[in-house]
């Protein structure tokens, strides 16, 4: 599903060149549940941006579902993101002036789905998350756990092949974090590849494979006992 070979990524800051990813190799198969760990500055956030087609890379190759992600126009990159990927963030990234249903339906708006259809689908996914009764509520009326469930429903509604989650439990208490990880497990059980970036060991242990990144390369990886 995801193949990286010799991936390099650098940033220019003033007169300095910051080499973040240094020839990284990685393979994640279809239907895997994987966590990516690393300290601040290890390159894990940059890696997630490349995987999410939010940033380019300098050298090497990145294949998503056997398609090379290279030299993409903004329009083409957006098409791949909308059709292949779902995103979940630590800060939820919900639109404050839209209710839960409207937030969940948003990806379908960009795909040209009619309002009636996308709202029906949004209600279906909110129901799956146990939030059907919260459809008309605004983000500021919901708890952190509820907001993250809305964000997960939004990521799922376009039926992506891969979910990319960046510190999805970072703003949640321990019990809610475990509930969210159980949701990711259920999503993964349907055949969707789930990749979670985290610095929390107990969260990584809820995935099937843990990849540790250090100084822009994979330092180690192992199968979780989960």
Spell out what each predicted region is.
Residues 2-213:
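ABC family nucleotide-binding domain
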Residues 210-222:
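H-loop (His-switch) and adjacent beta-strand-loop-beta switch element
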Residues 225-226:
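ABC ATPase nucleotide-binding domains
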